[in-house]
C-alpha cells in the first residue's frame, strides 16, 4: 500500500473539490449574469440598448476571457498529464496489477476527452471570432448603406440604424448566453466525468480493500504463529480502517457531488428555458423590427410620392394662379370697358334726350314758322289789298281832282268825309295796328316791320 491515502491521490490527480461557498458564489454570479442579460434585453426591446461598438468590445472581451480560460485549461491538463504519468510510474513500481493500469488507461481516455472538449471550445472561439469578423463586416456595410441613405432620408436612416443596433445587440446578448450555456455544458460534462471516475475509483478501491482484506486474512492464517508479523497486521488493519474512512468520506463527497450535479442540472434546465424564451423574444423582436423597417420604407415611399404630388399640385396651382391673374386682368378690362360703355350709353341717352328735345323744339319752331308764314301770308294778302285800295284811292283822287278844283272848299271836305266814311281807316294805319309775335321769345313787331321780324326769328332760332 502507498503511504498516501486514496483521498490524497484523488485530490492530487483531479484537484480539490469546489466548496459549497464557491458553488454558491458561482450560482449567484450566474443569476446576476442572467438578470443583467434580462435587463439588457428589456433595454433593447424598449429602444434603450447600447451601441454596436460596445457590443463588439464586449464580445472581444468575452473571446479574450475564453482564450485565457483555454490556456489555463491547457496548462491544467498538462499538469494533470504529468501527475498521471507520475502516478503511472509510481503504481508500476508499487503494484503490478492490470486493473490499475486499466484504470489509468480510463483516466487517460478521460483526459483525452477533456482535451477534445478543450479543442471543441477553441473551435467555438474561432467560430465566434469568424462570426465577429462577419458581423463587423456586415455592420460596416450597413453603416455605409445607412450613411448613404442618411444623405437622402435622415429619419428612416436613423430608424434603420437604431433597429440594426438593437438587432446586433440582441445577437451579441444571444451569443453571450449561448457561450455561457456551452460553458455550463462543458462544466456539467466535466463534473459528470469526474463523478463517474470517482465512482469507478471508489469501486476499485473497494475491490482492492476486499482483496487486501482477503490476502491479509490468508497471510494472517499462515503467519499466526509468527510474532514479528503482529505489528504488520496492526499496521495493515490501521491502513484498512483509514481506507474505509476515506471510502466513506469519498462516498459522502460523491453524494454531495450528485446533489450539486442535480442542482446544476436544474439550473441548467432553467437557464436553457430562459435562453429559449430569450430566443423566442429575440425572434419576435426581429420580426417586429423587420415589420417596422418595412413600414418605415412604405412611409418613406409614401412621403416621397406625396412630395412629388405636392410639387405637381404646386405647379398646377401656380398655373391656375397665373390664369386667374390673367382672367382678373381681363375682367378688369371688361369692367372698365363696361363702365365706359355704360357712360357712353348714358351719354347716348342724354344725347337722344337732347335730340328729342331738339326735334320737339324743331317741330314747335316748324309749327311757329308755319304760323308765321300763315300770318305773313295773311299780312301780305292784306298788304296787297291795301295796295289795291291805295291804287284805287289814287285813281279816284285823280278822277275827282277836277271836281275838287271847280267846287268851293266845303265841297272838297265832303269827299274826304265820304272817303273817311267809306274807309274808316287807311291801309297804313291798319298795317301799323296789326302786330306779329316771335314764336320763340314772343316779341311783337308791327306788320310793317316784318323784315326785321324775319331777321329776329333767324337769330333767335340759332
Swiss-Prot record:
Keyword Cell cycle in annotation: yes
Biological process annotations from GO: cranial skeletal system development; establishment of protein localization; midbody abscission; mitotic cytokinesis; regulation of phosphatidylinositol 3-kinase/protein kinase B signal transduction
Post-translational modification: There is a hierachy of phosphorylation, where both Ser-423 and Ser-426 are phosphorylated at the onset of mitosis, prior to Ser-434. Phosphorylation at Ser-423 and Ser-426 is required for dissociation from the centrosome at the G2/M boundary. Phosphorylation at the 3 sites, Ser-423, Ser-426 and Ser-434, is required for protein function at the final stages of cell division to complete cytokinesis successfully.
Signal peptide (residue range): none
Top-rank lineage group of the source organism: Eukaryota
Chain segments carrying region Disordered: 1-26, 410-430
UniProt-listed Gene3D superfamilies: Geminin coiled-coil domain, Nemo cc2-lz domain - 1d5 darpin complex
Region span, Interaction with TSG101: 157-235
UniProt feature, compositional bias: Basic and acidic residues: 1-11
Residue spans of biased composition, Low complexity class: 12-23
A single GO cellular-component term on record: centrosome
Start and end residues of each stretch annotated as Interaction with PDCD6IP: 160-214
Chain segments carrying region Required for localization to the interphase centrosome and to the midbody during cytokinesis: 354-462
Localization terms from the record: Cytoplasm; Cytoplasm, Cytoskeleton, Microtubule organizing center, Centrosome, Centriole; Cytoplasm, Cytoskeleton, Microtubule organizing center, Centrosome; Cleavage furrow
Coiled coil regions, renumbered to chain: 50-400
Stored InterPro entries: CEP55, EABR
Keywords from the UniProt entry: Cell cycle, Cell division, Coiled coil, Cytoplasm, Cytoskeleton, Mitosis, Phosphoprotein
Residue positions, PTM Phosphoserine: 96, 99, 423, 426, 428, 434
Complex and partners: Homodimer. Interacts (phosphorylated on Ser-423 and Ser-426) with PLK1; the interaction is indirect via the MTMR3:MTMR4 heterooligomer, occurs during early mitosis, regulates the phosphorylation of CEP55 by PLK1 and its recruitment to the midbody where it can mediate cell abscission. Interacts with AKAP9/CG-NAP; the interaction occurs in interphase and is lost upon mitotic entry. Interacts with PCNT/Kendrin; the interaction occurs in interphase and is lost upon mitotic entry.
Function statement: Plays a role in mitotic exit and cytokinesis. Recruits PDCD6IP and TSG101 to midbody during cytokinesis. Required for successful completion of cytokinesis. Not required for microtubule nucleation. Plays a role in the development of the brain and kidney.
Protein name per the record: Centrosomal protein of 55 kDa
Amino acid at each position: 500500500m502507498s503511504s498516501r491515502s486514496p483521498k490524497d491521490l484523488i485530490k492530487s490527480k483531479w484537484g480539490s473539490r469546489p466548496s459549497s461557498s464557491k458553488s454558491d458564489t458561482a450560482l449567484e454570479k450566474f443569476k446576476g449574469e442572467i438578470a443583467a442579460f434580462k435587463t439588457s434585453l428589456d433595454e433593447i426591446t424598449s429602444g434603450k440598448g447600447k451601441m454596436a461598438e460596445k457590443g463588439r468590445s464586449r464580445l472581444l472581451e468575452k473571446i479574450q476571457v475564453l482564450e485565457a480560460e483555454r490556456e489555463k485549461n491547457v496548462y491544467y491538463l498538462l499538469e494533470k498529464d504529468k501527475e498521471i504519468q507520475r502516478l503511472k510510474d509510481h503504481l508500476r513500481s508499487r503494484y503490478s496489477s492490470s486493473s490499475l493500469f486499466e484504470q489509468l488507461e480510463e483516466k487517460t481516455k478521460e483526459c483525452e476527452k477533456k482535451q477534445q472538449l478543450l479543442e471543441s471550445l477553441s473551435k467555438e472561439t474561432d467560430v465566434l471570432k469568424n462570426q465577429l469578423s462577419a458581423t463587423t463586416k456586415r455592420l460596416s456595410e450597413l453603416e455605409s448603406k445607412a450613411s448613404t441613405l442618411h444623405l437622402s432620408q435622415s429619419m428612416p436612416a436613423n430608424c434603420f440604424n437604431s433597429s440594426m443596433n438593437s438587432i446586433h445587440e440582441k445577437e451579441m446578448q444571444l451569443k453571450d448566453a449561448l457561450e455561457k450555456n456551452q460553458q455550463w455544458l462543458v462544466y456539467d460534462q466535466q463534473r459528470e466525468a469526474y463523478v463517474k471516475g470517482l465512482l469507478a475509483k471508489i469501486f476499485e478501491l473497494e475491490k482492492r480493500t476486499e482483496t487486501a482484506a482477503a490476502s491479509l486474512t490468508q497471510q494472517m492464517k499462515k503467519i499466526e504463529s509468527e510474532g514479528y508479523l503482529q505489528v504488520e497486521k496492526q499496521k495493515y488493519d490501521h491502513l484498512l480502517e483509514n481506507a474505509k474512512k476515506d471510502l466513506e468520506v469519498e462516498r459522502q463527497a460523491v453524494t454531495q457531488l450528485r446533489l450539486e450535479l442535480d442542482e446544476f442540472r436544474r439550473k441548467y434546465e432553467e437557464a436553457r428555458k430562459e435562453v429559449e424564451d430569450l430566443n423566442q423574444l429575440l425572434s419576435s423582436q426581429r420580426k417586429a423590427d423587420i415589420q417596422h423597417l418595412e413600414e418605415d420604407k412604405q412611409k418613406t415611399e409614401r412621403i416621397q410620392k406625396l412630395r412629388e404630388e405636392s410639387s405637381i399640385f404646386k405647379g398646377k396651382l401656380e398655373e391656375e394662379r397665373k390664369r386667374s391673374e390673367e382672367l382678373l386682368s381681363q375682367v378688369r378690362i371688361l369692367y372698365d370697358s363696361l363702365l365706359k360703355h355704360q357712360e357712353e350709353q348714358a351719354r347716348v341717352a342724354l344725347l337722344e334726350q337732347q335730340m328729342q328735345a331738339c326735334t320737339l323744339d324743331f317741330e314747335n319752331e316748324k309749327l311757329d314758322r308755319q304760323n308765321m308764314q300763315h300770318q305773313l301770308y295773311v299780312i301780305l294778302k292784306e298788304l296787297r289789298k291795301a295796295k289795291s285800295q291805295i291804287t284805287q284811292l289814287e285813281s279816284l283822287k285823280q278822277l275827282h281832282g277836277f271836281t275838287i278844283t271847280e267846287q268851293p272848299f266845303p265841297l272838297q271836305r265832303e269827299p274826304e268825309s265820304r272817303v273817311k266814311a267809306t274807309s274808316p281807316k287807311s291801309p297804313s294805319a291798319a298795317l301799323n295796328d296789326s302786330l306779329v309775335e316771335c314764336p320763340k321769345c314772343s316779341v311783337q313787331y308791327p306788320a310793317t316791320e316784318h323784315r326785321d321780324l324775319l331777321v329776329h326769328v333767324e337769330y333767335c332760332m340759332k
